[in-house]
Amino acid sequence: MVETQPSDVPLLAGISEESAALVTAGGVTDVPAGQVLAQAGDPGFGMFVVLDGTVVVERGDLHLDIERNGFFGELALLVPGSPRIARVRARTDARVLAIPREAFDQLLETEPSLARGLLRELAARLVQARTGH
């Protein structure tokens, strides 16, 4: 299997080398299948990008698979102090990149394309949640 690097992730494509260093400062973690990455109610400190594998976001009857190049936990960045709203666990063995709030805030200042990509994805998720498509 070819491992995905942060620069391969569409959301992060085209960012400067300096910004890429900020992104990777949060660290990459290998997560075994079944392991819980976040619980609803946990404090949110940042977002995660799935580099390999699949994680599932579980909230009530909603189960949303986030696969390679996808991300989760972004609400913690957009609404400071907000707790996690769902449980997230690895459906398969996975590699995730953590992006802490401080790094994300700096990225938004220097990389407007990141904000646009994030907004597009959030809008698509909202449409999917409301329409089922």
Question: What are these regions, as identified by a protein language model?
Answer:
Residues 5-9, 20, 39, 74, ...:
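Residues at structural and domain junctions
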Residues 30, 35-93:
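Cyclic nucleotide-binding regulatory domains
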Residues 7, 23-24, 51, 67, ...:
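Alpha-helix boundary recognition
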Residues 8, 15-18, 83-85, 102-133:
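A small-molecule sensor/coupling module
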Residues 94-103:
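A short hydrophobic beta-strand segment most commonly corresponding to one strand
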Residues 61, 70, 76, 100, ...:
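Short, flexible helix/strand-to-coil boundary loops that buttress conserved ligand/catalytic motifs
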Residues 1-33, 77-80:
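Cyclic nucleotide-binding regulatory module and flanking cytosolic helices
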